[in-house]
Amino acid sequence: MQIIIRDYQKEDCSAILEIINDAILNSTALYDYNERSLASQEEIFVEKLQKGFPVLVAEQNARIVGFGYFSEFRFREAYKFTAEHSVYAHKDHIGKGIGKALLTELIERASQQKLHTLIGVIDSENTNSIDFHKKFGFEEVGFIKESGYKFDRWLHSVFMQKMLK
């Protein structure tokens, strides 16, 4: 089945909210504790778009099956050529090429925007995501012990980086 990657539209947000809230409640993909509201998620995306960052949607059979974006890595001016990205697939579509299609397009958009490097911050237990990023040329460049606390345990963050050409 064909995967269509396109720019986010406001009416996509409720489908995206289902994906992100599932990740919040059932995984360490996000270090949030509480589900997001539709209004708060819309606000997050509006802010990214207003700053010129892409928010992308993966669609298959007219259904949203994933999304991704990049935005500031840090808020100091000297970091303006570095972005942090995130990619999420619906739990029923993991391992089916959704993340690959999204990350491929995000890397292309980052290059078009003349970014120098992309950063991914991944929970250390998420070895599938770490291996996935390595396939795209990301390298492990940092490890922060006990940087988060969720599900009654300390979590460690792996920083992965891809230099763009």
PLM regions and their residue ranges:
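Conserved acetyl-CoA-binding loop-helix of GNAT-fold acetyltransferases
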Residues: 95-108, 131-135
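Acetyl-CoA-dependent GNAT
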Residues: 7, 36-92, 103-104, 163-164
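Conserved catalytic-core motifs of GNAT/GCN5-like acyltransferases
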Residues: 72, 77, 119-122, 134, ...
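Conserved GNAT acetyl-CoA-binding A-motif
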Residues: 110-122
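Conserved GNAT-fold acetyl-CoA-binding loop/helix
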Residues: 17-46
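A short beta-loop-alpha structural element at the N-terminal edge
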Residues: 3-18
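Conserved beta-strand-loop-alpha-helix junction that forms the acyl-donor binding cleft
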Residues: 94, 120-130
